[in-house]
Amino acid sequence: MNTNPASMAVIGAGSYGTALAITLARNGHQVVLWGHDPKHIQQLQQDRCNRAFLPDAAFPDTLRLETDLACALAASRDVLVVVPSHVFGAVLHQLKPHLRKDARIVWATKGLEAETGRLLQDVAREVLGEAIPLAVISGPTFAKELAAGLPTAIALASTDVQFSEDLQQLLHCGKSFRVYSNPDFIGVQLGGAVKNVIAIGAGMSDGIGFGANARTALITRGLAEMTRLGTALGADPSTFMGMAGLGDLVLTCTDNQSRNRRFGIMLGQGLGVKEAQDNIGQVVEGYRNTKEVLALAQRHGVEMPITEQIYQVLYCHKNAREAALTLLGRTKKDEKIGI
């Protein structure tokens, strides 16, 4: 047990949580990393690396592991939550009794609340109350590249100006990690959820063998869907041309480090949903996000035809090629109508 102060407590010891913890520690900050599985944390402590996901990224001396949640949270007022979206609310409930009175919460989770499709800010407010400062980071980041110290840029949005400035100072590294602040709290959250869905579609297109033209069309029209939904929810449309929108969308739609894209490729090649998920071996956020994003769009009367067809493939057993033909056969329209 170690209660020495830390600049940040990172909750979630998967690939991305570990990569962010390493990045913070390399910036010279004291960081404590906690995960839900004590055996996993003990193994990380023994190996001084995350051998399962990031075997080549050694832990800096300023990164310590913690199996006791209360101790991890007592060490820092600033808490970075990096867990799958479907357990986000449950994890916040777990954290709540142990948070310091001056705690501030930031998350790197991309997605919406399971079943309800609510933005994660609404979940956080419900669990933690209105007073606690909140923030979100999002953008084109693969954990392996981040942990390797390769150049990366993200967007940061917060409900609190001081928290935003403090986080930018903590995270920013002039050698490899650039952090752009953005006042659009809704837009930065939403981009990370919608891009997961479109990445599955881009993967399906490539799995079928449709080529670069089709993939690019899906990215472009997927961006239009993201922007339409964001605008309906009160986001700034320009956010979706930045790191949390177009940046993350292009990354996950074009590189096979993306689990969502690889999942889509397998579906396009004819594998079933369960088999494709098993082959990935990690959480495919876009699978749940598809249902949640579509439900959110329908509640707000927003047309999202690509998302609708991906939903049909994932949940209604529609063939991926048939879904593509449905999109191609839609009524002719002006590109600028409804974005």
Swiss-Prot record:
Top EC class, one word: oxidoreductase
Keyword NAD (UniProt): yes
GO biological process: carbohydrate metabolic process; glycerol-3-phosphate biosynthetic process; glycerol-3-phosphate catabolic process; glycerol-3-phosphate metabolic process; glycerophospholipid biosynthetic process
Enzymatic reactions: sn-glycerol 3-phosphate + NAD(+) = dihydroxyacetone phosphate + NADH + H(+); sn-glycerol 3-phosphate + NADP(+) = dihydroxyacetone phosphate + NADPH + H(+)
One example GO MF annotation: glycerol-3-phosphate dehydrogenase [NAD(P)+] activity
Active site: K195 (proton acceptor)
Chain sites annotated for binding NADPH: S15, Y16, H36, K110, A143, R259, V283, E285
Keyword NAD listed: yes
This protein's UniProt keywords: Cytoplasm, Lipid biosynthesis, Lipid metabolism, NAD, NADP, Nucleotide-binding, Oxidoreductase, Phospholipid biosynthesis, Phospholipid metabolism
One Pfam family in the UniProt entry: NAD_Gly3P_dh_C
Subcellular location: Cytoplasm
Annotated residues for binding of sn-glycerol 3-phosphate: K110, G139, T141, K195, D248, S258, R259, N260
InterPro entries for this protein: 6-PGluconate_DH-like_C_sf, 6PGD_dom2, G3P_DH_NAD-dep, G3P_DH_NAD-dep_C, G3P_DH_NAD-dep_N, NAD(P)-bd_dom_sf
GO cellular component: cytosol
Coarse class of the protein's main subcellular location: cytoplasm
Highest taxon, organism lineage: Bacteria
SUPFAM superfamilies registered for this protein in UniProt: 6-phosphogluconate dehydrogenase C-terminal domain-like (SSF48179), NAD(P)-binding Rossmann-fold domains (SSF51735)
Its job: Catalyzes the reduction of the glycolytic intermediate dihydroxyacetone phosphate (DHAP) to sn-glycerol 3-phosphate (G3P), the key precursor for phospholipid synthesis.
Family: Belongs to the NAD-dependent glycerol-3-phosphate dehydrogenase family.
PANTHER family for this protein: GLYCEROL-3-PHOSPHATE DEHYDROGENASE, GLYCEROL-3-PHOSPHATE DEHYDROGENASE [NAD(+)] 2, CHLOROPLASTIC
HAMAP family xrefs: NAD_Glyc3P_dehydrog (MF_00394)
The name this protein goes by in its record: Glycerol-3-phosphate dehydrogenase [NAD(P)+]
Name of encoding gene: gpsA
